[in-house]
């Protein structure tokens, strides 16, 4: 976790969680849903978090109900749930300042060697109205490298293809396969449940 990411999380504490419910962006409690998920390296506890994917995935797919899960130690899940009680305090400038100063003192972020060693395991689950279910998994480079490589790939695509002006998610602009073409990425693996 980089200091910048940690500070973004501190800022988000006061806002609670987010999910897409029946096509609408909805506020939900922190740690709203908890379950065990095999992201690709064995089952782990995971909880919902308010990442931007609840918006971008909806823009890309039109899927009406979207939650984003991240692997989380159980103690942190319970801390997030307990944090729902103290959420009103989290927006106070003094609390924000104190928590960010803790980040400055304690969070150093992954160094280059650590980042080179890390991979990201992405998991998705979809169900249709008939109850059919599919799971998709993807292994990529660490999140920092993926972000840089993805941004550069989109830039090259725009330069080469000159798409119509507008607002796009990367998959709507370049196709879902873009992520498979990035350094350190594998292929999508789809399975029935």
Give names to the regions the model predicted.
Residues 1-127, 132-135, 145:
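Active-site-lining helix/loop region of Rossmann-like oxidoreductase modules
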Residues 111-193:
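C-terminal helical cap and adjacent loop that interface with cofactors, partners, or active-site loops
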């Amino acid at each position: 976790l980089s200091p910048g990411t940690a500070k973004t999380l501190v800022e988000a504490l006061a806002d609670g969680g987010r999910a897409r419910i029946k096509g609408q962006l909805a506020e939900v409690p922190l740690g709203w849903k908890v379950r065990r998920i095999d992201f690709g390296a064995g089952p782990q506890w995971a909880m919902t978090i308010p990442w931007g994917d609840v918006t971008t995935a909806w823009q890309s797919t039109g899927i009406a109900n979207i939650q984003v899960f991240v692997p989380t130690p159980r103690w942190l899940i319970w801390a997030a749930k307990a944090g729902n009680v103290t959420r009103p305090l989290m927006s106070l400038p003094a609390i924000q300042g104190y928590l960010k100063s803790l980040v400055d003192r304690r969070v150093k972020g992954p160094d280059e060697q650590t980042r080179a060693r890390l991979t990201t395991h992405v998991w998705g689950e979809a169900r249709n109205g008939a109850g059919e279910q599919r799971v998709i998994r993807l292994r990529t480079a660490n999140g920092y490298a993926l972000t840089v490589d993805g941004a550069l790939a989109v830039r090259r695509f725009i330069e080469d293809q000159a798409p119509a002006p507008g607002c796009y998610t990367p998959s709507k602009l370049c196709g879902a396969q873009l992520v498979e073409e990035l350094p350190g990425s594998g292929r999508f693996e789809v399975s029935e449940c």
